[in-house]
């Protein structure tokens, strides 16, 4: 991996973590073409932490409000003042995030099953997952607009969104896209659905990183901390720009374009993957691999 590769991966992670197009799927496809191997895990963790920082910066007032409500809730429980029915938006959203996140706990025991699709030698599965994401986006665009805000969310809403987040562990299924779609299906307003989706990503990203970073550091792969630092900064900076873009697209009601994008990308991945399986060749971008593939081919011919 070189500096160009880590910058490209940082840009991809920063954009696709928040745009409803699947960051894991894009990184899996990019790593497939760039022929990145053993250091993929630690790189993925660092890039995800970069986007985590972007969420904290972009939604700090709401996140801080939820943190305060967490401690106030504990106080109310011990003083007998807690009421499930009478909660403000931050407190109710805090509980809904906890419920949705709790659904990931048993699923993470099977994390190797999900990550195995990123480490295989083809991108056909990612292609079908991209198409699944496109279907969700098209369906959510056609559903009746809801009027339910954060203070009106129910446990059933959190369960439905949490279940969709579990499905999004597959590379190619957009976490933000699928959870936003689930929120819209539950009758949430677009702003509430998107805000909840982004904040819900915090414990998911943080928990996944904590579980994976131990395994990554135990590996014998030599790490370039300068490159990883660059990737972290790039993913955080691009992530902030992506969040601003999503907010703008939300106002303009243009999420449908991501459905077309993921559908086309999915078909392309399936086509390329099928070609690679049929021919035994792997298509890679030579300028990203320092022309190693062409040099090897030329050497064999001479």
Question: How should these model regions be labeled?
Answer:
Residues 1-302:
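Multi-pass membrane proteins that catalyze or facilitate reactions on polyprenyl-/lipid-phosphate substrates
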